[in-house]
Structures are given as structure tokens and as C-alpha cells.
Regions:
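Short sequence motifs at beta-strands and strand-loop junctions characteristic
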Residues: 15-21, 33, 49-51, 82-90, ...
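Signature of Gram-negative outer-membrane beta-barrel scaffolds
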Residues: 2-101
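Surface-exposed extracellular loop regions of Gram-negative outer-membrane beta-barrel proteins
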Residues: 49-76, 84, 97-143, 154-179, ...
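Membrane-embedded beta-strand positions of outer-membrane beta-barrel proteins
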Residues: 41-43, 94, 108, 144, ...
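Gram-negative outer-membrane beta-barrel transporters
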Residues: 32-39, 154, 159-164, 178-264, ...
Length: 303
């Protein structure tokens, strides 16, 4: 099976155990710099250790040690020798909050973050791969917005810009690569209004553009500038909550997912969907009963 120099085989491909330990040091400072303005600064140092133990023959042979029917005798799957790996990352955030009045705030925040490689991304390898080539994925983001609260309403609106480097993905050959870059920008919102003492209408959503910002060929198509697959522009959740009595609550929810591409080449599209869900909670004397019906119309969707 497979191509001549990338041979799959029947049998066991991997067998390993990994012990992981995570350590973190962090500090946060919240300081008023003016009567109505506060500064929030945080820093976090994190270390993730993997102790990997291979339970099979190391290398690219079959599980019994025999060679595959390829030009050099190697097989598709690569099992590293037992080893230990560590990932250290320093992240920080700085934010500012300004009170316009008793009900309205303005805010802005810059932050960095990371995602260490997952166990399967660094130890379930193919023969072309090396653990040392896989680094942590990095993220930087900036957002600003407004929050307003009153007895009958809640409004939160923010705009954001985010960039990711060293994005970990699998290419068309199912090989983990670590050189991806993506850009994300858009708006997010939460709007809530009490229609009456028992009815509350809420809308939570985001409208954003997610794009690949690096060159990589998938077939003969360069994905640089393409929309990220499985990343819809619009996601929205509209709910109507009814609090009939102190012990009964019900909620009708409409979830909308915009269309999105199914592949990095942007050749195939999922049309999106809108579905309705119903939830209720009833508190009895000693127990709470909850239930929900999802996708009331029975619409065929992809999740």
C-alpha cells in the first residue's frame, strides 16, 4: 500500500507512552492610573515537559523489524527513540479600562499566547519528519471595544486583530508542518435586552475574516491569501429566555453558521446552516430536571 517510497503496512504502526508535566509562574498587576482609568498587566512563564517511551522497534521498519517494499526499505511511519522534550514559553498581556460613566466602559488589550505541540503531533510521525522541527505555535492579538450595562440591557462590542505564527497543520501528504501563518480580524458582540420581567432576548456572535498568510502549494494552488477552511465569517446565536416561575426556565435558541470552505484551496464550500434548539430546566423539591431538543426542524447539518 502507498506509493513506492512511502509504504504503508498492515500491523502495529505506533505503541508509546508519554508522561507530561506542566509548570507555570505568573503575575498580574491591576493599577488605577487615573480616577476613571485602570491598567492591567500580566505575565506568564510556562514549561511543558514530555517524557516519551517507545514500546516498539524504533525507526521506519514494520512492527516485526522487517523492511517495507520501497526503494530504500523504509516504511511510511517513523517511531522515534525514547526521549524527553520541553517547551518553554513566555507570554504577556497589557490592557486598559476606562469608565466613561457608571454604566459604560471602554477597553483595549494586547496579548500574546502559545500552543505547545500535542502528543500525537510530535510522536506519531512519518519518515520525512523530525521532532526537532516542530515548535510551539505563537499568537498575538489586539482588541478594543465598549461595554454598557443597565437594568434592562447589556451591550458588549469589540473589534480584534490576531496573527498566528508557527501554525501546526497537516499538509496534503498528512505530514505535520510547523511553518504556517494566519491572520484574523473582525468584530464580536453580545447584545441582551429584557423584553419584560420574564422574557430576555440575547444575541451573541462574531463576524470575522480568517486567512492564510503564507505560501504553500496544495496541488498547483498557492493558499496564500485564501480563506481558512472550516472557518465561517459569521457565527450567531439568538436566544429567547422565558423565566415563568422561580422553578421553571425555558429557552428557544437559533444558531446560525455561515458558509465556509472545506479545503485550503477554497474549491469546495459547505453552505452553512441555521437550526433551532429548545431547552428547559425545572426545579423540584429535591432535584433539578433539565432537558433539551436540538435541531428542532431535523435539518441535515455538518458539525
Amino acid at each position: 500500500l502507498g506509493i513506492a517510497n512511502n509504504v504503508r503496512f498492515q500491523g502495529k504502526h505506533y505503541d508509546f507512552e508519554v508522561d507530561s508535566n506542566q509548570y507555570a509562574l505568573y503575575a498580574n498587576l491591576n493599577q488605577k492610573i487615573q480616577t476613571d482609568t485602570a491598567l492591567d498587566v500580566g505575565v506568564r512563564l510556562e514549561k511543558l515537559d514530555y517524557d516519551y517511551s517507545n514500546k516498539m522497534i524504533s525507526g521506519t521498519t514494520r512492527d516485526d523489524g522487517s523492511a517495507c517494499n520501497s526503494t530504500d526499505g523504509s516504511c511510511r511511519y517513523f517511531r522515534p527513540d525514547s526521549r524527553s522534550d520541553s517547551f518553554r514559553n513566555l507570554n504577556y498581556q497589557i490592557g486598559i479600562l476606562h469608565n466613561l460613566n457608571e454604566t459604560t466602559n471602554l477597553f483595549a488589550r494586547f496579548a500574546t499566547a502559545y500552543r505547545a505541540p500535542q502528543i500525537n503531533e510530535i510522536y506519531r510521525l512519518q519518515k520525512e519528519q523530525s521532532i526537532d522541527d516542530i515548535k510551539s505555535q505563537n499568537l498575538s492579538s489586539f482588541e478594543f471595544g465598549i461595554k454598557r450595562y443597565s437594568e434592562s440591557s447589556q451591550v458588549e462590542i469589540s473589534a480584534f486583530v490576531m496573527n498566528k505564527d508557527n501554525v501546526i497543520i497537516k499538509d496534503t501528504n498528512n505530514i505535520v508542518v510547523n511553518d504556517g501563518q494566519t491572520d484574523h480580524k473582525g468584530i464580536e458582540w453580545l447584545l441582551s435586552y429584557k423584553l419584560s420581567s420574564r422574557l430576555t432576548l440575547t444575541n451573541v456572535g462574531s463576524f470575522a475574516k480568517h486567512t492564510y498568510s503564507y505560501s504553500r502549494l496544495y496541488g498547483d494552488i498557492d493558499i496564500n491569501g485564501n480563506a481558512i477552511d472550516t472557518a465561517p465569517k459569521l457565527i450567531s446565536n439568538l436566544s429567547l429566555k422565558y423565566e415563568g416561575t422561580k422553578s421553571l426556565t425555558s429557552e428557544l435558541e437559533i444558531v446560525h453558521l455561515d458558509k465556509y470552505f472545506l479545503d485550503p484551496q477554497n474549491l469546495h464550500i459547505y453552505p452553512g446552516h441555521s437550526i433551532a434548539n429548545l431547552r428547559f430546566t425545572k426545579e423540584l423539591k429535591n432535584i433539578k430536571v433539565s432537558g433539551q431538543i436540538t435541531n428542532l426542524s431535523g435539518t441535515l447539518i455538518s458539525e
